[in-house]
Amino acid sequence: MLQNIGLKITQIYKFPMVEKKNIFLNGLIDLAQSRLGSKIIYKTDEFFAPAKRIINPWPPVFKEGVFDKNGKWMDGWETRRKRSKGHDYLILKLGRPGKIHKVDIDTSYFSGNQPSKVSLEACFSKKKTPGKNLKWITILKKIPTKPNSHHYFNIKNKSIFSHIKLNIFPDGGVARLRIYGSMIVKKRFGKKTLNLTSVLNGATPIVCNNEHFGRAENILAPGTGKNMGDGWETRRSRGKNFDWLIIKCAAPGKINKIQIDTHHFKGNYPDKCSLQAAYITKKVSSKSIIGKSTNWKFLLNNVKLYANRKHNFRNKLMKNQKINYIKINIFPDGGISRIRAFGKAE
């Protein structure tokens, strides 16, 4: 059984409140990101910048004075100036179908060349390319865009979608398209050991206190982190605080191995970390789970971390307890590339 031993967090550290900017946690992930298998399958034009950049999971950048053969290099999708009727659009196939809750149409660094307006349509198809007779549903009506801005919108239609169409009127550039939602995963895991904190298996980030330099959902992504930006990283802590992230596992299960990967984090990795866990059967809100998590049992006691390394823990784990939520505490702050919790689903 898990034992409530180790560092008594609430007695030593102040418990930081959730920052208001964490608006896309609560189990939502970016369904459009390329590392989940999402692909651009059609675009009317990409003269100035290729459409595939719009689903890059990392934030857009601006390269001062950099030009390619067609003009200024831009980190996003940019079409040529339209000299005829109509508008430009692209079609995105999601890596996994899902229910869409929120979107962000990001025009960062596009100023004077952003679209006048944009809209979104969606459909469900088992084929790579939707048929011509398939009906597209408007999920975001035509709205004006601003230069160098994030455009956040809630999506009311909670149908399952597999394809997204981004319309830009009449032309222009968009840095990133974020489709935040819940992935539909066929959870037929059997008796094999799997990573219960992998987003591809259905794990989701619920709430964290900070993600200033790196998004919390990165920690659940497949594969090895590409760089320091491909991980969860918090701001520098000033005081007796610690940072934390709560994850809902892909399925309830018993954990037999934990891997904490600090790849690329060399001068900014956490000094120590601990893991708490719980098995919760009732539906709980992100707000209520924060307070309850302080009393969760310790899955992994306070352990030392090192730079740019995969830390594997077996013997130090408190085993033989079914869990479906994990809370990772990092002391006092810093960055982690991936967390992998291996076990069998039950």
Residue spans for each PLM region:
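N-terminal amphipathic/basic-hydrophobic helices that include classical n-h-c signal peptides
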Residues: 1-16
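Trp- and acidic/polar-enriched beta-sheet ligand-binding modules for extracellular glycan
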Residues: 12-89, 109-244, 253-254, 264-346
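General structural concept
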Residues: 90-92, 101
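A short glycine/threonine-centered beta-strand motif
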Residues: 94, 249-251
